[in-house]
C-alpha cells in the first residue's frame, strides 16, 4: 500500500482509500425466500474484505462470506451495515443503500 500513497503516513493513506470507494448495499432473495445482504465496492484486497466481513458478521450476529469481491451476509441488514461502515470510517456520502 505504501507504493500507492507516495510516502504518506499509513493512517492518512488508509483514510484516502476509504474516501475513494463507492459502496453499494442491496438485498437479494435466494432459494426458499432467504434474503442475503450484498455489500460491494469496498476493496479489491481479499484480506481487507475478509477483515471487514468478519467484523460485520460479529456485530450483526449473522453468517456470511466473501465471494467475487463482495461481502454476502445472511438476512436483511442494509441499514445496520451502513451504520457500521460509517463507524469504520467510510464516508456516508459514498454509501448507497439500494431498496
From Swiss-Prot:
It comes from the Archaea. Keywords: Protein biosynthesis, Translation regulation. InterPro entries: DENR/SUI1_TIF, SUI1, SUI1_arc, SUI1_arc_bac, SUI1_dom_sf. GO terms for biological process: formation of translation preinitiation complex; regulation of translation; translation reinitiation. It holds the Pfam family SUI1. The keyword Nucleotidyltransferase does not apply. One of its GO terms (molecular function) is mRNA binding. Coiled coil: none annotated. Belongs to the SUI1 family. PANTHER family: DENSITY-REGULATED PROTEIN (PTHR12789:SF0), DENSITY-REGULATED PROTEIN HOMOLOG (PTHR12789). This is Protein translation factor SUI1 homolog. It comes from Sulfolobus acidocaldarius (strain ATCC 33909 / DSM 639 / JCM 8929 / NBRC 15157 / NCIMB 11770).
